[in-house]
């Protein structure tokens, strides 16, 4: 095929590196932090640091202490002595009354886990300002609630709530404009997942937040919600004995995170009876080595929307190449110059889907497995990584691995020309201009959106 010769060439694994964006609290990397306020404890707050260090030392049996990375000067937890693989660092009870953990209680049927935890944070902060009890103010959960960053975190929250009084005149109108413009940005970038996640979140929080009535209360609630989304762990019962729930654990929140698996040296689990949350060493850890948790498999969109930064490196970032198997196969049919009504191709496509288990059997016949996550199978990731489903489908329909890879390269070039041409760049900059002038969005958030788009461009370029 002529198109195959045109795109078959030696692959280069290198590409221009994208901008590094990350949080000093949540992400570990080797360049200066972009957002210093994301650290849980501000440098210079000696009393806060002393209180937290005492908690860390006590509850880790002197295995860990607060310290600073010599290169980045980012605060984190460091090994106070050598720690063996599988050795426990923290063992935190998941009882509601335990002072070391916030647990969503779902006592109010109108609240989901995020609302439950946000209200607990606000209650602790409120009580600390009205109580004369010094012991209560030093209690870990109260100290934690008061040490959280004052700024609202995450673009999703800044689209759904009042943002630190930066919006003028008609706040509701400005907020809605910001939300719509960010949705337009995701549309222009072709990031359907990010747009859907933002829309789902806005719908989820809008009715709940409006119940507060007063602007000041809504602002506080939005702030608390923004803290909760980037600091919780999901607890699931493998035996199905109870519904999943979320927890916030102040001591564990002091750990920095990484998306680079080689840097991760601690992991977490829940006891089988769901009675405790445990952090343990993933491998042997040397004295004075920083303790690092993994972010897990998260796309950049989640960090952008809810964490307020992008990891310096994220092997789990991706670009969607096709929505589903039908779009992929129809595109390939067109690439080969076949008529869209060609019955021979219809039979080939059906056979391909059947062979790969992408059809489910029903009494009335076969139908496409239209799982909501199907489109996440057809993705490109950093370092020119093509997901297995894409390769399997294209190999099956073409019968040749080189042709499958060549087809992916053609598709990547096509997406670049459709979403990242000079006209597209100009359109994106117009959106940014409106965000700055009409909604007073922070310049740093604009740069974050720009970096997100550039990283997607880099992923596409790497495969070509």
Place the predicted regions along the sequence by residue.
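N-terminal chloroplast transit peptides
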Residues: 1-24
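Ala/Thr-enriched low-complexity intrinsically disordered regions
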Residues: 8-10, 36-39, 130
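Intrinsically disordered Ser/Thr phosphorylation hotspots
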Residues: 15, 31-32
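Cysteine-centered motifs
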Residues: 27-31, 38
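Long, positively charged leader/targeting segments at protein N-termini
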Residues: 43-96, 100-108, 125-128, 136-464
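Intrinsically disordered, low-complexity polar regions and short flexible loop motifs
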Residues: 113-114
């Amino acid at each position: 095929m002529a198109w195959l010769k045109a795109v078959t060439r030696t692959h280069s694994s290198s590409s221009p590196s994208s901008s590094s964006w990350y949080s000093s609290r949540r992400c570990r990397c080797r360049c200066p932090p972009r957002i210093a306020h994301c650290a849980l404890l501000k440098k210079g707050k000696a009393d806060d640091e002393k209180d937290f260090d005492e908690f860390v030392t006590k509850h880790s049996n002197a295995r860990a202490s607060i310290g600073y990375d010599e290169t980045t000067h980012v605060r984190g937890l460091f090994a106070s002595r050598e720690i063996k693989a599988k050795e426990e660092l923290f063992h935190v009870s998941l009882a509601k009354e335990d002072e070391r953990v916030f647990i969503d209680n779902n006592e109010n049927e109108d609240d989901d886990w995020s609302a439950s935890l946000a209200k607990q944070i606000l209650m602790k902060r409120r009580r600390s300002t009205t109580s004369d009890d010094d012991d209560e103010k030093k209690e870990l959960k109260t100290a934690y609630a008061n040490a959280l960053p004052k700024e609202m975190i995450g673009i999703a929250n800044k689209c759904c709530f009042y943002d630190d009084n930066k919006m003028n005149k008609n706040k509701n109108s400005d907020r809605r404009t910001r939300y719509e413009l960010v949705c337009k940005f995701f549309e222009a970038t072709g990031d359907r997942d990010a747009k859907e996640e933002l829309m789902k979140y806005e719908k989820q929080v809008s009715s709940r937040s409006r119940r507060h009535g007063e602007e000041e209360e809504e602002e506080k609630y939005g702030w608390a919600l923004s803290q909760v989304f980037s600091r919780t762990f999901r607890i699931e019962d493998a035996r199905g004995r109870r519904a999943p729930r979320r927890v916030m654990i102040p001591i564990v929140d002091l750990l920095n995170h990484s998306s680079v698996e080689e840097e991760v040296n601690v992991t977490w689990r829940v006891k089988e009876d769901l009675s405790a949350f445990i952090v343990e060493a993933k491998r042997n850890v040397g004295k004075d080595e920083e303790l690092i948790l993994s972010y897990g498999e998260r796309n950049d969109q989640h960090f952008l929307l809810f964490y307020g930064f992008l990891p310096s490196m994220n092997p789990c970032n991706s670009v969607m190449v096709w929505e589903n198997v039908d779009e992929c196969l129809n595109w390939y049919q067109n690439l080969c110059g076949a008529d869209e009504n060609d019955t021979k191709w219809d039979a080939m496509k059906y056979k391909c889907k059947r062979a790969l288990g992408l059809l489910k059997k029903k009494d009335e016949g076969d139908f496409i497995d239209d799982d909501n996550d199907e489109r996440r199978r057809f993705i490109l990731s950093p370092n020119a990584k093509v997901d297995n489903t894409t390769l399997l489908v294209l190999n099956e329909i073409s019968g040749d691995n080189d042709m499958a890879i060549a087809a992916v390269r053609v598709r990547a070039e096509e997406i670049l020309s459709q979403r990242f041409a000079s006209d597209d760049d100009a359109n994106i900059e117009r959106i940014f201009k409106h965000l700055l002038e009409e909604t007073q969005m922070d310049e740093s958030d604009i740069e974050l959106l720009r970096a997100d788009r550039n990283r997607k461009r880099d992923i596409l370029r790497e495969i070509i």
